[in-house]
Amino acid sequence: MNEKKAVILLSGGLDSATVVAMARDEGYACYTMSFDYGQRHRAELQAAERVAKQLAVVEHKVIGLNLNGIGGSALTDTSIDVPEAPSEGIPVTYVPARNTVFLSLALGWAEVLGARDIFIGVNAVDYSGYPDCRPEFVAAFERMANLATKAGVEGQGFRIQAPLQNLSKAQIVRKGSRLGVDYAMTVSCYQADDDGRACGKCDSCRLRSAGFAEAGLADPTRYF
């Protein structure tokens, strides 16, 4: 019997850690992929390593990219301040085409591994309004994946799974806690320091804090 494999995008944050735990619970052999893309919050990479180890993934890859060479985002260009108050429209923390790039590389690895499922922790309920977190984007990428690959053309097919898509942050936290995720290991803050401590002010910090509060669970986040 063939092993059921999945490639999972793992940023080191709360959502992606939960997705790894969910995939493992569903019986997948988990292969996780993180990206060192020039992000200001590089502490998330150490968090991803910790999560991958805690959840006993088969293999964890860190891919180097130079998205700060493109810029255009507060996460990759330190001359753009990370907003510390809610904003209208798509915020400056949006990284141009990031999820398209990340999923494309995950797709390549999945094809090599013979994995047919790719998991991503995007969410369209408690989220920052990024266009590449919407269900329409996920569905469109899946169609493209099955048109653009040898495996897809030969009928083996890929599925892009976004199991958090319609969950609130509180629901995500409760689910991950039940599955044994140690959220103290994760880093969500857009401007976390080198030790992984959070600012408590950015959009990601606010969503995370509200999720734990609504879930009625202790927030293990460390702040600077």
UniProtKB/Swiss-Prot annotation:
Keywords: ATP-binding, Ligase, Metal-binding, Nucleotide-binding, Queuosine biosynthesis, Zinc. It catalyses: 7-carboxy-7-deazaguanine + NH4(+) + ATP = 7-cyano-7-deazaguanine + ADP + phosphate + H2O + H(+). One of its GO terms (biological process) is queuosine biosynthetic process. Pathway: Purine metabolism; 7-cyano-7-deazaguanine biosynthesis. Pfam families: QueC. Belongs to the QueC family. Zn(2+) binds at C189, C199, C202, C205. This is 7-cyano-7-deazaguanine synthase. Disulfide bonds: none annotated. Binds 1 zinc ion per subunit. GO terms for molecular function: ATP binding; ligase activity, forming carbon-nitrogen bonds; zinc ion binding. Coiled coil: none annotated. The keyword Heme does not apply. The keyword Signal does not apply. Catalyzes the ATP-dependent conversion of 7-carboxy-7-deazaguanine (CDG) to 7-cyano-7-deazaguanine (preQ(0)). ATP binds at L10, S11, G12, G13, L14, D15, S16, A17, T18, V19, V20. Its cofactor is Zn(2+). Its EC number is 6.3.4.20.
